[in-house]
C-alpha cells in the first residue's frame, strides 16, 4: 500500500499531469539502459519493416487477399507490426528516458502494448484453427472457412483483445488493490486475469497444433506410400504438410519467446521480487519483440505463395526502375546545336504536338 500512497501524492500534486510511474519500476543501470535502447531500436525497426513487407505482399495480391489463411497471417503481421512500434517506443521511453506521462496516457500506452501482443497470440490461435479445419475437413473446408467468416472472427478477436487490454484505462487499477511489482498502476488481480486469458489462448494453440502436427505426420506416411506413383491431390497434401510444419515452428518460437516473461509475471503474484529479477524481466520482455521479428521470417522462408508474391513484386519494381532509366537516356541533352534546331523546326510545324501532350 505504500506504492498507492506514493501514487496519490504524485498524482495529487498537479492533477496527475506530472505522473511519474514510480522510480521503483525504473531499475536498470546505465549500461543496461544503453543495451535496452540499442536492442529495442534495432529489433523494433527490423521487425516493423519485416511485418510491413508481409502485409504489403498480402494486401497487394488479390489471390492472397481472397484466402482466409492469409487473412489470418496478415492479422498476425499487423499485430506484430503494431507491437514492434508501440512496445519498442514505450519501453525505451520508460526505462531509458524515464518518460513522464499523465495517469490516463500511461494506462493508454500500457493498454496498447497489451492489446497488440494479445492480438498477436489471438491471430496465431485463429491460424491454428484454420489449419485444423483444412487438414481435418478438406472436402468442406472452403464452405466452412469463407472470407466473410474469417473477417468476422478477426473482428471479434481484435475487439475482445482491445476490451481486455484497456480495462485498466476504464478504471480497473490498483489502489486500494495491491499493485503489480512489474507494471505501474496495474493491480495483481487484473494481471492474474490476463495471464489466465493468455493461458487459455496458449492451451487452444497447443491442442490445435498438436492435432495438426499429428495429421501432418499421417500425411507424411501417406506420401511415403505413394511416392512412386502419381496420386490426385498429392500437391495439396504436400502443401498442408509444409504449412503444418511452419505453424509448428511458429508455436515453438512463440513458447520460447513468451514463457520466460509469463513465468516471471506469475512469479510476481506470489512473492516479492528483487531488483535483479525485475531487471531479468525487462530483458525477457524483449523476447516478445524477438517473436514479432521472427514470425515474418518464417513465413517468407516457408510460404511458397508469399515468396512468389515477393518475386513478382521485385520483378515489377525492377521493370519500373529500368523504365525510369530508359526515359532518362531518351531525355539526354542534344549533342549539337544543329540537332536541337532541327527538333525545334519539327515541333513548331502545323499539327505538331508537344511531348507533354503526346503522353496524355
Curated annotation (Swiss-Prot):
Residues 1-33, 93-104, 173-188, 268-279 are extracellular. It comes from the Eukaryota. The chain crosses the membrane at residues 34-59, 72-92, 105-129, 150-172, 189-214, 247-267, 280-301. InterPro entries: Canbinoid_rcpt_2 (IPR001551), Cnbnoid_rcpt (IPR002230), GPCR_Rhodpsn (IPR000276), GPCR_Rhodpsn_7TM (IPR017452). Residues 327-360 are annotated as: Disordered. Gene3D superfamilies: Rhodopsin 7-helix transmembrane proteins. It is a multi-pass membrane protein. One of its GO terms (biological process) is negative regulation of synaptic transmission, GABAergic. SMART domains: 7TM_GPCR_Srsx (SM01381). Heterotrimeric G protein-coupled receptor for endocannabinoid 2-arachidonoylglycerol mediating inhibition of adenylate cyclase. May function in inflammatory response, nociceptive transmission and bone homeostasis. This is Cannabinoid receptor 2. It comes from Rattus norvegicus (Rat).
